[in-house]
Amino acid sequence: MLSSNPGPIGVFDSGYGGLTILHGIRQLLPEYDYLYLGDNARAPYGPRSFDVVYEFTRQAVVKLFEMGCHLVILGCNTASAKALRTIQQNDLPQIDPNRRVLGIIRPTAEVIGDLTTSRHVGVLATEGTIKSESYDLEIHKLHPDIEVSGVACPFWAPLVEYNEADSPGADYFVKKRIDEIMRKDPEIDTIILGCTHYPLLMPKILKYLPTGVRVVPQGEYVAESLKNYLERHPQIEQKCAKNASVHYLTTENPQKFKEQAQIFLHEPVEVDNITLG
């Protein structure tokens, strides 16, 4: 039986990248409690099939519900692309129709129309997110006139995970993908970082992008979207506890998570190990 008492807002990611989303949310909405779950033991999700990503994401969402969350944010583009819709349509009605799961692709798609002048947008993301065409679909639904080009960046997330963001290898792989997307569509004036790890590569990304091309990290837009959502849905907002606390869970070694999390958050964290599946 799931608790009906107010609980934390859950944030889920396959690894550490969702910490950039959590950071953005906490900057704007510091008063709420948060519970972050990283399925680091099974990361990365990017190359995995739709079915596997859905099953892993469903397990995480159920666990967060069991731990008191009434609202869960999928702070992972791959999970948002491959699992969100099925969970919303098929699982929530059976688990608890009053609970909510939100993704991070839609909030980015909503604001992109105000950010691009040329109406040509690039998406840099994992292979799974690019193959799903989720950004193309969401952007075209809202802004049919915008041309979207995507490029998969398979080595970018591991560069961040293994603390290699400042290495010469990072320069090589970042330049390679930036050159590729600008060749694909030279009229691009706005780039969406469609993986939550990528903001940590921002100095390298800006180094190789042509002058005047804007980069859109997701954290601030997801936070603004969540704020608006809670204002529009008071019945959900009332179920979100407000003690300004944050706790972290990982499916891997907690000590490793602590060390990596500090790269993303620049602050020490308390973390517990958890098993999914």
Q: What is each of the regions a protein language model found here?
A:
Residues 1-277:
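Non-catalytic structural scaffold of enzyme domains
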